[in-house]
């Protein structure tokens, strides 16, 4: 029988990751209790989203069961939040008898996007395109690299021709710094099909960047979390996106020590979508109206263009909160329109390729 390759994210996961939902949540409660006893000076980010709802219920049940000290809860308001989310945060605080402090960024979403640009497709793609716009490296270097017989020599030449542009060269040429092709990784432009050709034929007329997330969420979080020993978040593997490489210990992606000496705890990391649905049904958890009434499947910074469903989601929100939809279009509209152009371009290219056989 042929061996099946399993990544370390799979092979190094703890045994409870494969338990059924009831047993898994029981195991997680024990883990929560252990870490809260060891690190009682803990802070938890509560977003008002569905993962956060499962997490706060699990944390508070565990606290009551093991008589553990209170957790500091914070809600980071980016400045572009639905009323449904803000109302739900208040209702959740009342439900559990806890305080959920609202924290606002020093640089708001409007200021951040005006100064740095707006996201497009993904955080990785936004970072790559932002650097390309800043460095002004021509897209033609990708053709040079593709056509070069000695790709390592060509990569070296490009480094000398465009100093201090390492990441941009790798991004555009879909290679690494040694000149080895890396066409199938997330850190290159063609991780989004035909993107390099698209921006060549339809250059963006606006600034692209995902720094709004840094300024409106990450910086605010670092400011508030710095005095706590343990930071608790609702991150889950089933969400996808960027994840850290696991260490040798099998709980590396659930519980880690940061370079600052703090601990980062993700109690829901191995909770699947099915586990989450079971918990909601079994304990009768009510999500915010954004889910239960509007019909959204995810929430966050309203209308963030990194979501491929951003425009569709805004239309679900519009009947209930037209003003926040208008604000999202004013802030992210250029990115929405450019995404629509890219999607149309991609489909046309796929159709053309299929017709040619």
Residue ranges and their predicted role:
Residues 2-14, 40, 222, 251, ...:
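ATP/NTP-dependent adenylation/nucleotidyl-transfer catalytic domains that generate, transfer
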Residues 2-275, 280:
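ATP-dependent adenylation/nucleotidyltransferase module used to activate substrates
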């Amino acid at each position: 029988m042929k061996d099946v390759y399993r990544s370390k994210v799979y092979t190094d996961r703890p045994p409870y990751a494969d338990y059924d939902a009831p047993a898994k949540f029981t195991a997680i409660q024990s883990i929560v209790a252990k870490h809260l006893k060891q690190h009682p000076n803990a802070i938890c980010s509560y977003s008002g989203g569905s993962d956060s709802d499962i997490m706060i219920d699990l944390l508070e049940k565990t606290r009551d069961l093991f008589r553990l000290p209170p957790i500091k809860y914070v809600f980071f308001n980016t400045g572009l939040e639905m009323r449904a989310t803000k109302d739900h945060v208040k209702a959740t605080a009342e439900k559990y008898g806890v305080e959920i402090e609202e924290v606002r960024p020093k640089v708001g979403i409007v200021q951040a996007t005006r100064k740095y640009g707006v996201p497009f497709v993904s955080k990785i793609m936004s970072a790559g395109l932002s650097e390309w716009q800043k460095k002004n490296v021509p897209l033609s270097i990708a053709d040079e690299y593709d056509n070069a017989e000695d790709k390592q020599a060509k990569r070296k030449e490009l480094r000398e021709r465009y100093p201090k542009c390492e990441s941009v060269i790798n991004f555009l040429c879909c290679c690494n710094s040694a000149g080895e092709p890396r066409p199938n990784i997330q850190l290159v432009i063609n991780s989004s099909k035909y993107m390099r050709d698209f921006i060549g034929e339809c250059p963006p007329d606006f600034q692209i960047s995902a720094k709004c997330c840094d300024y409106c969420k990450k910086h605010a979080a670092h400011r508030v979390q710095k005095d706590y020993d343990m930071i608790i978040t609702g991150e889950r593997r089933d969400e996808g996106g960027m994840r850290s490489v696991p260490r040798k210990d099998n709980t590396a992606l659930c519980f880690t020590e940061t370079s600052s000496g703090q601990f980062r705890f993700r109690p829901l990391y191995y909770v699947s979508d099915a586990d989450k649905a079971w918990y909601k049904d079994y304990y009768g958890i009510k999500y915010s109206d954004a889910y239960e009434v509007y019909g959204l499947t995810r929430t966050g910074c309203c209308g963030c263009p990194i979501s491929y469903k951003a425009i569709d989601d805004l239309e679900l929100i519009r009947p209930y909160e037209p003003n926040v939809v208008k604000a999202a279009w004013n802030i992210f509209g250029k990115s929405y329109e450019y995404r629509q152009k890219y999607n149309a371009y991609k489909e046309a290219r796929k159709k053309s390729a299929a017709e040619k056989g």
